[in-house]
Design a protein with these regions (language model features):
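Conserved AMP-binding/adenylate-forming
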Residues: 2, 29-30, 45-89, 225
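Structural core segment of the AMP-binding/adenylate-forming
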Residues: 9, 50, 77-157, 484
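Conserved pre-ATP/AMP-binding loop-to-beta segment of ANL
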Residues: 18-19, 147-183, 190, 215-221
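Conserved AMP-binding A3 loop
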Residues: 32-34, 170, 179-205
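Conserved AMP-binding/adenylation subdomain of ANL enzymes
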Residues: 202-221, 231-315, 324, 349
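Conserved ATP-binding loop and adjacent catalytic segment of the adenylate-forming AMP-binding
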Residues: 248-251, 328, 335-397, 405-408, ...
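Conserved ATP-binding/catalytic segment of the ANL
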Residues: 393-394, 398-453, 470
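Conserved C-terminal "lid"/linker of ANL adenylate-forming enzymes
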Residues: 476, 484, 515-554
Length: 554
């Protein structure tokens, strides 16, 4: 397979879409593609004159914004290696990642700038403020001079105009060249630096072009909700759309469901990329209350009326997401079965994909028209997927993936790399699943999360949690093991409890009723013996999956 230059795709998009809108900070300023090119060129001049060379590491840590995107593009198209860091990480984690990655420069957002301690990152030559690219810290005279005289140097290099023909970016030498190092939060509680090669960025962009290229056109609007420092948001809310010539809107502050819903209504995106939590919250808050009255339930069960009612409900759900999208692509964590069953029953245009940072990220996908509910699609373009099981259709086994999207390995961690990528090039995901005869993959849980029943039965806590989360007043839950008993930690929906004027005793009674109902829905060996109320929301990773390693029954 011949893999073209990824940076050539970036360069071509900038030139082809020169006078079109490119990046907008929601309710703020807009950069056109030529503005992006000009900003990239200025950063290249600063890099060159401050001593940054090809292969140097440049870290970025801040909320999504147009300037974050520009700094990332400038890094790759200069030939440096990008190190995106999630802004939600604690300061010590940021320090550790900067140091471990050998970063030379660090771009920081406004909040991160006030939290980090430069003295704990001795290898850095400078810290640059993302909102205006000013210097927060400079440890070399070259960097100080380059930033102070940047406009002057740009004017000398381009005395009249900066034109399309001046755009001349670094082209990677081969597809295996390292493009970026992406540090995962990881379910084990420590970060690993995933080395993402250019071929993986291209593989994901080419996959997106294959499945969405005819549905999305230059100038279409896209909303960036997921953090760009996470591969899911990076690949499918930024890179593909930028290459396509779309107009990307950044929600620069922590987006609540209300803000997201408002943005959907105003921007009307052409495709929506999301994690289950966002979809579930919007459905539960904006849609379920309207359809859970007795009259609506009765109409839904009358065959003649049911179809029209479902069409009307589908329109309502679609309008909650802007009403202009080809499909909603959901990934990043397990999708609640109650919400998924509802969306499927009313004909909502959604699909669920599957991926991992180590595959930058896509592994499985299927268009909504052919999507099998409960699955996460089939092996994506350029990828192979198999289940490590003697009977992949019926007995869950580890999901393995192979193809150009797979990482080079973990930075400075050969042992972890060998444990994750075998000698035949298969990436071992750590997830358990089955595959039907048509190639649809069904995730059964993470192998690390698997619990053992009293008689050695495999118990997948996610399956129990999925049912429990659909019961009364349950916002979220974690199932843990104590000896041979299973205990469910439940964070209640306190807003709903308050609406119903329920006190602590009544809430406890509801949870006991939930436990009894839950146990009628699951095998005897996985019955829950106790529900404990957990007052605070569970801590989550940036992709909104619960950090279950933090919670025990003790």
């Amino acid at each position: 397979m011949e893999i073209p230059s990824f940076n050539a795709l970036i360069q071509k998009s900038i030139v082809d879409h020169w006078d079109m809108d490119a990046l907008t900070d929601y309710k703020g300023a807009t950069l056109q593609y030529h503005d992006v090119a000009r900003k990239i060129e200025k950063l290249h001049i600063m890099f060159e004159n401050s001593g940054v060379v090809k292969g140097d590491k440049i870290a970025l840590c801040g909320r999504n914004s147009a300037n974050w995107a520009v700094a990332f593009l400038a890094t790759l198209t200069y030939g440096a290696i990008a190190v995106p860091i999630l802004h939600e990480f604690m300061p010590d984690q940021i320090h550790n990642i900067v140091n471990h990655s050998d970063a030379k420069l660090l771009f920081v957002g406004d909040v991160v700038a006030t939290q980090i301690d430069a003295t704990k990152m001795p290898g850095l030559e400078g810290i640059i403020y993302i909102p205006d690219y000013s210097l927060v810290v400079s440890r070399t005279d070259k960097l100080t001079y380059a930033r102070e005289h940047l406009n002057e140097m740009f004017g000398i290099k381009y005395p009249k105009y900066f034109r399309k023909n001046h755009v001349n970016y670094y082209m990677e030498q081969n597809p295996d060249e390292l493009a970026m190092i992406n540090y995962t939060s990881g379910t084990t509680g420590f970060s690993k630096g995933v080395m993402v090669p250019y071929r993986a960025l291209w593989g994901n962009a080419d996959f997106a072009e294959d499945v969405l290229g005819k549905k999305i056109k230059p100038g279409d609007s896209i909303i960036s909700i997921l953090p760009m420092a996470h591969m899911y948001g990076m690949a499918f809310e930024f890179i593909f759309e930028f290459i396509k010539g779309c107009h990307i809107f950044y929600l620069t502050r922590i987006p609540s469901p209300a803000i997201i819903a408002e943005a959907f209504g105003r921007i009307k995106p052409a495709v929506i990329i999301s994690v289950p939590l966002v979809i579930e919250k919007i459905i539960r808050k904006k849609v379920f209350p309207k359809i859970q009255n007795n009259r609506m339930r009765m109409l839904l069960h009358m065959p003649v009326i049911s179809k029209k009612v479902k069409e009307k409900i589908c329109d309502q759900v679609s309008n909650a997401f802007g009403g202009n999208f080809y499909e909603v692509i959901i990934g990043g964590a397990a999708f609640n079965q109650e919400v998924e069953s509802f969306l499927h029953s009313v004909g909502f245009k959604y699909t669920v994909g599957y991926g991992a940072t180590e595959c930058a990220p896509i592994i499985c996908y299927e268009d909504y028209k052919n999507f099998v509910p409960g699955s996460c699609g089939k092996a994506a373009l350029h990828m192979m997927v198999r289940i490590d099981s003697p009977d992949p259709e019926n007995v869950p086994g580890e999901i393995l993936a192979k193809g150009p999207n797979v990482m080079l390995g973990y930075y400075k961690n050969e042992e972890a790399t060998k444990q994750t990528i075998d000698e035949n090039g298969w990436y071992h995901t750590g997830d358990l699943g089955t595959m039907d005869g048509d190639g649809n993959v069904f995730i059964k849980g993470r192998s690390k999360n698997m619990l053992l029943g009293a008689n050695g039965q495999n118990i997948y806590p996610e399956e129990i949690e999925d049912k429990l989360n659909s019961l009364a007043l349950v916002a979220e839950s974690v199932v843990v093991q104590k000896g041979d008993k299973l205990i469910a930690l439940v964070h209640p929906d306190y807003d709903e409890a308050q609406t119903l004027n329920l006190g602590t005793k009544e809430l406890t009674d509801v949870m006991e009723q939930n436990r009894q109902e839950l146990n009628t829905m699951i095998p005897a060996y996985s019955k829950v013996s106790e529900i404990r109320i957990h007052e605070d929301e569970f801590e989550k990773t940036p992709k909104k999956s619960i950090k279950r390693f933090l919670y025990t029954a003790e």
